[in-house]
């Protein structure tokens, strides 16, 4: 029944608990059988999402509550996955904004909420984690209201219902002093405040594909919301792509969501979010319609990429030892496969057959792709992320980001100085009276590349940093965020030995310990000065029959610095690459031998 259908998207900042909230909604509605084993954080389906605690792909689930059926779409919180967010908004009639009762709305919440308002959706606000120490729900409600006013919300959008919840304990209420035993107030609010889909049941079929899934058994699965009409298995349809080309196809199965599973359905009606198989190669934004009434829905717009980097074939001496897929053809095939469902990604071939230029919405967007490829057994070398400049009205412009930092007062000075050097403008400063300060900045994207790891060191790991893309504006002159220190480069291939590493410790910090395999041109540490230094880490202690009268000195090594993929990408300079294999992340110079490096430097100077 169409009157009993509700479509809703969940918006939240990373770590404000939306995925846990969906868990509880599913469990308490009785959608899961009493016998079914329930996983924690059911919505984060791939390993990477579970490890990082972030949602990357938008996902769908459906809940039966009393006689109502509620379709819930989980949206990614990061602006880097803006391409995903854009499409979700076209499928739903309202949004559930989940905000932490202590943190309040964050810049990434702002990004997604802005998109929702642009689509004319009305919000329901859920203040989550009201049981956490230091929770200040009333302050958060004021902050949310201010945010909505800043985003030019209409009067209807500003008249939003507020539900207080503690998703972990599975309780909700209309007042944070007086909570119900379970989530009923939230279900009730969804049913009361979300409009039923406004669609035409009797017209000819029309639906738009807003997500794609793939399954080896049935091939490409298109997911979307039926705009009007009905669809049955084995029905003949016409598909229109974004360029207006049409082709005919026959629907395989029609699947509706229930809980986390997809269930075969004999018929699906307008307003429902369904998955459909058997239509061959589909693309996002394709319209599926009745062959007698071929009309396309407006194409979904996606934000343009702002950061690009080169993916190259791994040319190091250890190439092919750890990974299964190493050739340029395999890398290109994998990137093209990613393009099918990762809409905000761009891949271009370059003059060099072994390098591809990959552009995305931000460092996180690209590093998630690299991490996924690495887990699948790929080996590749990647360059430093670079910002994409645009020419607008004859003027060269660069992307700017809104950054929110939350730091302890003692670190405030050094953080503000560092952001000043990186050409950031302070927009707002808000001390919370308990020793922490929230700073709001607008900063060029290139000023942020490499800043996160420096920021973590500066605040001894206590600082929080969130950023989202803001706008394009004129370029600020001068270089930003150059690395201050040089690096230590290995001069040969073999096993690093403790005796040699011990002698190098005075020169800087090392990336590897005793027994690690190294090759010529690999970066093995950070130099304590600003120049690069080629060093020998392979020489063991010579054995002679002469011994000092005392005992030998004990060789004690400081534990090496282990870098994650993001840290390595932020650390490198333009003449360096990160070598990524399934088991290790190494950093190397683009030119491996010292002679090649000198020649390259000479060439640059002559230019």
Curated annotation (Swiss-Prot):
Effect of mutating residue 375 to A: Still binds to 70S ribosomes in presence of GMPPNP
EC number: 3.6.5.-
Outcome recorded upon mutating residue 427 to A: No longer binds to 70S ribosomes in presence of GMPPNP
Stated name of the protein: Large ribosomal subunit assembly factor BipA
Gene Ontology biological process terms from the UniProt entry: ribosomal large subunit assembly
Native species: Salmonella typhimurium (strain LT2 / SGSC1412 / ATCC 700720)
Effect of residue 547 to A: No longer binds to 70S ribosomes in presence of GMPPNP
Stated regulation of activity: Ribosome-associated GTPase is not affected by low levels of ppGpp, >40 uM ppGpp and >50 uM GDP inhibit GTPase. The C-terminus (residues 387-607 or 481-607) inhibits GTPase activity, in its absence kcat increases, but GTPase is no longer stimulated by 70S ribosome or 30S or 50S subunits.
Comment text on domains: Has 5 domains; domain I (residues 1-202, also called the G domain), II (203-305, also called the beta barrel domain), III (306-386) V (387-479) and the C-terminal domain (CTD 480-607) which is BipA-specific. Domains I-V are homologous to domains in EF-G and LepA; although the domains are similar, their relative arrangement among these proteins is different. Domains I and II are not required for ribosome binding, although in their absence no 30S binding under stress is seen, whereas domains III, V and the CTD are required to bind both 70S and 30S ribosomes.
Entry similarity comment: Belongs to the TRAFAC class translation factor GTPase superfamily. Classic translation factor GTPase family. BipA subfamily.
This protein's record includes keyword GTP-binding: yes
Domain of life: Bacteria
UniProtKB keywords: Cytoplasm, GTP-binding, Hydrolase, Nucleotide-binding, Ribosome biogenesis, RNA-binding, rRNA-binding, tRNA-binding
Positions bound to GTP: 15-20, 128-131
Reactions that this protein is recorded to catalyse: GTP + H2O = GDP + phosphate + H(+)
Result of altering residue 586 to A: No longer binds to 70S ribosomes in presence of GMPPNP, altered secondary structure
